[in-house]
Amino acid sequence: MDDTADRSAEPPAPPALRLLTPVTVLVDADETVADALDDWSRGLEWVCWLFSSVRQRMEHLHFAPPGPLPPAWAAFAQGHVRSHLGPHLIAAAQAVLSGDLERLKALDHQLSGRLDPAQAARSREAGGILLRNTRGARYQGILGRYRSAQEAGQTPGHFLTVWAGVGNFFQLSLANVIAEYLRLEWDMAARHLPEKDAALSHDSIASLTRQILHGQKLALRVVA
């Protein structure tokens, strides 16, 4: 993360003692492990704080399992995620990188047509949480312009669209933006399960991330 960037909105100080939070760090082929871990550690507290706000306020995001979790997750991952949620996140991230607000708004409206009414409502609610919790940060670029458009009713404010902007603001790689989204979906669905049944392996997240990124010419390694 760029140390010169001035961000006035700071996450609450973490408690002295807390449970360890699992994360998945994916390294691009031309990136060193040390650099990847350093970049990720700088954004880790923000990601944990922002996503904890979503988890605290909502029961589910897009994934609301109708039955046993493992088969429901497999169907969701290979269906909804690979068919439209993952591609949307990639396209939104590309629009953010190019500073193309009109493209970002168009993608946001397109996603509305791919979600059922309940998913769309939860997606907008979660997107609103991210937008509110990053409002005070300075030098937001396209994230700030997108927020203004959403507040003016020009775009729905879906979670994945907002997350693409937030991830870029904190200089997260596309691979880690995708991986942390997947972890959030799983954690929200599995939070009431016994600990031994609620864990999703790093390799599982990395494998699905690779599938989503297929064709993006990225080689990924799990390092933490």
Question: Where is each model-derived feature located?
Answer:
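Glycine/small-residue-rich interface belts in oligomeric ring/scaffold proteins
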Residues: 19, 26-102
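Internal, conserved structured core segments that host functional sites
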Residues: 90, 95-168
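Generic structural signal for well-ordered, non-membrane alpha-helical segments
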Residues: 47, 82, 86, 116-127, ...
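Short linear loop/turn motifs
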Residues: 72-76, 148-149, 181-184
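C-terminal auxiliary extensions adjacent to catalytic cores
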Residues: 2-41, 161-224
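Amphipathic alpha-helical hairpins
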Residues: 67-71, 110, 130, 224
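Arginine residue identity/basic-tract feature
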Residues: 7, 18, 42, 55-57, ...
